Amino acid sequence: MNTTDATDARTSWDGVYAARPAATDPRPNVRLTETVADLPPGDALDLGCGEGGDTLWLARQGWRVTAVDLSAVAVERLTGLARSHGLGDRVTAEQHDLGASFPEGPEGPEGPEGPEGPRDSKNPRDPQGPKDPQELKGPLGRVGAFDLVTAHYLHTAFPLDRAAVLRRAAHALRPGGLLLVVDHGSTAPWSWNQDPEVHHPSPREVAEAIALDPAAWTVERADALRRRATGPDGSTAEVTDHVLLIRRTA
């Protein structure tokens, strides 16, 4: 995304959020709650957080959450909401154009102990706790910062190399961590994109586009699921979610 595109995108999304009342307790996405409810909390990254329904839910479950959005309005609102709900110590909201920058995570770009040291060997996702830093660093030569990265409906009308963003998100995981990508699999009546020719890539197509090394990442789920959704005006419709769940194994 070039400078003009990025400015236009920020202005557009700021306008979207500014035009509607601020949410006081936004709801989390159902695909997040059903996937994450039984996981032990750790460090999470919420890409395209909006006003923060997923972020706040994760924080209430004990996760430390880095929440990212292109819109300064959304980031400011989420920061205020987290504080008002007593979750300010668990939520860090940051403005990013994901085509140009990416959050480093709670311990910086090289993980909890920098480029030379392993993370906590008592991580419940990795009970054996690899002692060799080279084993922990994996194929990128760096330690991931997150146990969970979520990207719900990360669609935009502006130029964005989404596959590159999701690839970077997968690399930001610690070994054992999960990348949850939920996309629109159908066009809702209230969608901003009513193009009848629009293609909704399947979860497998998304996985192929991300092009991760199967020696280090495993697709655990690739489903198309139906649900009843409610639009901004209160109307309801049957929609399809495309759900992709990838685990980093090395």
What do the PLM-derived regions correspond to, one by one?
Residues 176-184:
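Conserved beta-strand signature within the Rossmann-like core of class I S-adenosyl-L-methionine
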Residues 1-39, 42-50, 187:
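Conserved class I S-adenosyl-L-methionine
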Residues 71-73:
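Conserved SAM/SAH-binding beta-strand->alpha-helix loop
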Residues 64-69:
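Conserved SAM-binding motif I beta-strand of class I
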Residues 156-169:
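A short, conserved alpha-helix within the catalytic core of class I
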Residues 87-100:
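Conserved SAM-binding strand-loop segment of SAM-dependent methyltransferases
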Residues 104-108, 139-148:
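A short acidic, Gly/Pro-enriched loop at the edge of an enzyme's catalytic core
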